[in-house]
A protein has these predicted regions:
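N-terminal helix-rich module
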Residues: 1, 11, 19, 23-57, ...
Length: 147
């Protein structure tokens, strides 16, 4: 028998390659969504901690906001960042649950405290993180959402 591949072997290889190429976009989308989620949570956490530090250092109130209508967030004095479409955001400030049309804000005070509140960032139902701001200390902590 001569060395080489039969037609069936070549077709099997092409079939496997086609299957892998069909799965690649799905895997890429999941990877992109996961990356956007981690980046958004990390940036929110960093900006909230910076807002607290700036309030204490400069001796004046600094506001961190989430605009639910425009799907953006940020702190006073910085350009707002856009929330990716793949993420769902829910905020609770001053005991009021805001999920729709309004802008929520947490104010960091020169004393180190804040008005308190929490921001939940979800990438899929039940998968997410809550950024909680303690009203007394102004400390920002992360909690996994359990549903």
């Amino acid at each position: 028998r001569e060395r080489g591949l039969t037609l069936i072997e070549i077709l099997v290889v092409f079939g496997i390659l086609a299957l892998l190429m069909g799965l690649a976009p799905v895997a890429f989308d999941r990877l992109r969504e996961s990356s956007q989620y981690r980046d958004t949570v990390r940036t929110m956490l960093s900006q909230m901690r910076s807002a607290r530090q700036r309030a204490v250092t400069e001796g004046q109130e600094v506001r961190f906001f989430v605009n639910l209508r425009q799907r953006s967030y940020g702190m006073d004095g910085d350009a707002p960042r856009v929330l990716p479409d793949s993420l769902t955001v829910r905020t609770v400030v001053a005991g009021i649950d805001l999920t729709g049309e309004r802008e929520a804000s947490i104010r960091f005070l020169p004393t180190g405290g804040s008005t308190g509140g929490s921001i939940e960032v979800q990438r899929a139902p039940g998968v997410g993180t809550r950024l909680r701001v303690d009203w007394l200390s102004g400390r920002v902590t992360l909690e996994a959402l359990m549903q």
